[in-house]
Structure formats: structure tokens, C-alpha cells
A protein has these predicted regions:
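A single, central transmembrane helix in multi-pass transporters
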Residues: 160-162, 208-268
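Juxtamembrane intracellular "pre-TM" segments in multi-pass secondary transporters
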Residues: 1-4, 184-222
């Protein structure tokens, strides 16, 4: 377990720093430029990178996982140094923070699937694996919450150079935690990437066929595309909303992220603790949680229109908390239903196909957020998208 703890703590600092740096970058870039196009571009790159995580999965199967983890974290350190060099050499804080965040997004193509697969390659025995996974889950939740706090420190200084220096210290700490880690892992198979891509494509097509034949699953696909588009469009508008509408509260963007994260954790906790013998968390009630997600987004737009800034701030933060809860519960109910409604040997293919389809709307949302911001005010856009989400959920009731 000693090796596992080293990896978990390293991942904790890496995830914490990466999340805080992204939040700070979005806030800082919009505050300086007041141009939504920069936020859209960063969001687009991040979302496109997510679509290619299967490549990172193949690479993590082909290369020694511990060695690959050291390499990726080491590149993060060098990348942050590069950002500092750009900042001081060209005196361009926007370029320096954008380059750093973009390269980190590309690194996540490998890092995300690698951290998911490295634990089973090291632990021995079912009990150790369960214990290790519980530690990983706790560390991930804690880093997600604390990243909002760390980004608040970055925002307090409001300086890219200071933000990158603090990030560099934490990335170096993340690297030092694994630098002496033995590269010995369970023997893996030599992976032919071309063969795996072909197999993955075939699995995706098989998953698609099952989805088309299963009404319970297929009915939600178009609805999810609409809701994902609306959510990501709204989320990418949050730096703009925080700065343009709630300029009196410097830490509004951090509060929004923290509220959403805490809501997601509370939703998962509620299902885990209360689902036995309760009729609230059943597949039958999934449409209501979907409808409530749209309502929460609508309320965010509504509270943003209030004349009282304090009332608006409290309302928006609470609405994001509510959205996090409803989204978390809804996701658990839906994917649990999927797992129960398809043969066990097809679950992976079906869920993989569903996640791929759902994510197709994300880059479109990133592209759309900038032109939408020129049409009308941000609160009106958010209110309208919340209304669309609520209307999109109606067919699921039937």
C-alpha cells in the first residue's frame, strides 16, 4: 500500500493544481480581455482532448505505467517552467497561461486513463484493490473541492507569474512523491495500437446497435445531447457572468465551482446512503432529476437578473449546488438503469458508446458560447438555455 499512497498523494497534488490553474486561467483571461472567444477556444481544446483519451488508454497499456506517470508529471513541471519563461521573456501573461493550460489539456489525454488504470497494475488482491480505490475516490473528491480554494489564492494575487510559481511548486511536489517509485508493475501485454483502434471502433458500433434496439436507453440520447450542449455553454459563460454581473464579489467564479463540486459529492452520497428501501432514487424518478437540472440553470439566469447583488450571489451559488446534486443523482440512476438493462458482456461497449455520443455536443457548446454572448446579455442566455433543458426533458416522462 505504500506505493499506492505515493501515487494517490502525487495525483492529489497534480489534480488539485491542474484544476486551480484552469479556473484561474479562465477568470484571468476574461477579466483582462473581456473576450469570450478566448474562453471558447480553451474550452474547445479541452473538450476535443477528452475525445482522444482512448489514445492515452492504449498508450498506458503499452508502456510501463509508473514510468509513464513519472514522464507525464515531469512534463507538467517543464510545461509550467515554459509558461514562466514566456511570461518573463515576452511579457505576455495571456499567452503564458494559455500555453500552459493547453499543453496540460493535451497531457490529460494520457494522464486521465493512466491514473484510472495504474492502481490495478500495482495492488495484489481484491481487498487491497477495494481499499486503494476508496482512497483514490476520497483524494479525487478532496482535490476537486480544494482546487476552488487554491484558485481563490491565485485570484487573490491576480498575477500570472505568482500563479505559475505556486503551480510549479505543487507540480514539483507531485513529481517528488513518485520519483523514487519502483517501475515494477504487473506484466502487461504488448499492445498493437492499430489493432486496438479497430477493436474499439467495432465495440462502439456494437454498442450503437444495442442502444438503437433498447428504447429505455435510446430515448435519452437526443435529450442528453441537448442538455450537455446547454450545460457546457452555460459553464463556459460562468467567467463572464462572474466578472460582468457580479463584479463586486471577486471570488464568485470560485464559489460557483465549489458549489457545483460539493453538490455533486452530496448527490452521490445521498444515493449511496439512502437508496435502500427508498422510492426517491429509482429509475422511475430519473426524469424529475433531469427536469430539475434545467430548472436550476433557469434559476441561475433568473438570480443573475436581480438588482440586489447579494441576493443574486446567494441564489446563483445555491442553484449550482442544487444542479450538482440533481446532475449527480440523475447520472447514477441513468447509468445504473443502463447496466441493468443490457447483457453484462455488453455493458462496457454500451456505456462507452453512450459517453462518446454525449460528449459530441461539448465542442459545439464551446464554439457556440462566444457568438451567443454577442446576441444578448449573459443572464438571458442562461435563462433561455435552462428553459430549453426543461423542455427537452419532457419526452422522457412518456
Amino acid at each position: 500500500m505504500a506505493r499506492i499512497k505515493q501515487i494517490i498523494f502525487s495525483d492529489f497534488f497534480d489534480t488539485l493544481t491542474n484544476g486551480a490553474l484552469v479556473l484561474f486561467a479562465y477568470w484571468y483571461i476574461y477579466k483582462v480581455t473581456r473576450d469570450q472567444s478566448y474562453i471558447s477556444l480553451l474550452g474547445l481544446i479541452s473538450m476535443i482532448a477528452t475525445l482522444f483519451t482512448f489514445v492515452g488508454g492504449y498508450l498506458s497499456d503499452k508502456v510501463n505505467k509508473v514510468y509513464l506517470l513519472k514522464t507525464v508529471v515531469g512534463i507538467r513541471v517543464l510545461n509550467t517552467i515554459l509558461g514562466l519563461v514566456i511570461y518573463h521573456l515576452f511579457d505576455d501573461p495571456i499567452l503564458s497561461v494559455m500555453v500552459t493550460v493547453v499543453i496540460n489539456s493535451v497531457l490529460n489525454i494520457v494522464y486521465s486513463p493512466l491514473t484510472e488504470s495504474i492502481v490495478p497494475s500495482i495492488v495484489h488482491g481484491k481487498e487491497d484493490l477495494i481499499t486503494a480505490n476508496s482512497w483514490v475516490s476520497i483524494a479525487n473528491q478532496l482535490s476537486s473541492v480544494l482546487s476552488a480554494g487554491l484558485s481563490a489564492i491565485f485570484i487573490f494575487f491576480g498575477n500570472v507569474s505568482i500563479g505559475l510559481v505556486l503551480s510549479l511548486v505543487l507540480y514539483v511536489l507531485s513529481y517528488l512523491l513518485i520519483t523514487r517509485l519502483s517501475t515494477e508493475t504487473k506484466a502487461g501485454k504488448n499492445v498493437d495500437v492499430t489493432s486496438l483502434v479497430t477493436k474499439d471502433t467495432n465495440k462502439f458500433l456494437v454498442g450503437m446497435k444495442i442502444i438503437r434496439k433498447n428504447f429505455l436507453i435510446s430515448v435519452i440520447v437526443p435529450v442528453a445531447l441537448v442538455t450537455n450542449f446547454c450545460f457546457w455553454t452555460v459553464w463556459l459563460l460562468m467567467p463572464k457572468l462572474s466578472i460582468d454581473v457580479f463584479s463586486g464579489f471577486t471570488y464568485m467564479y470560485n464559489s460557483i465551482d465549489l458549489s457545483f463540486t460539493v453538490g455533486s459529492i452530496l448527490g452521490a452520497f445521498a444515493v449511496n446512503v439512502k437508496h435502500k428501501g427508498k422510492k426517491t432514487f429509482t429509475a422511475r424518478n430519473f426524469p424529475y432529476f433531469l427536469l430539475l437540472q434545467g430548472l436550476m440553470i433557469l434559476l441561475i439566469g433568473l438570480f443573475s437578473l436581480q438588482n440586489s447583488e447579494v441576493f443574486g450571489i446567494v441564489g446563483v451559488v445555491i442553484s449550482w449546488l442544487g444542479y450538482g446534486i440533481c446532475n449527480s443523482v440523475g447520472s447514477i440512476l441513468y447509468f445504473s438503469t443502463v447496466q441493468l438493462s443490457v447483457p453484462s458482456n455488453h455493458i462496457g461497449m454500451v456505456i462507452g458508446a453512450i459517453l462518446t455520443i454525449f460528449s459530441l455536443a461539448n465542442p459545439i457548446a464551446a464554439i457556440t458560447s462566444a457568438p451567443l454572448s454577442h446576441i444578448t446579455t449573459t443572464p438571458i442566455i442562461i435563462f433561455s438555455l435552462g428553459t430549453v433543458m426543461m423542455l427537452a426533458s419532457v419526452p422522457v416522462f412518456f
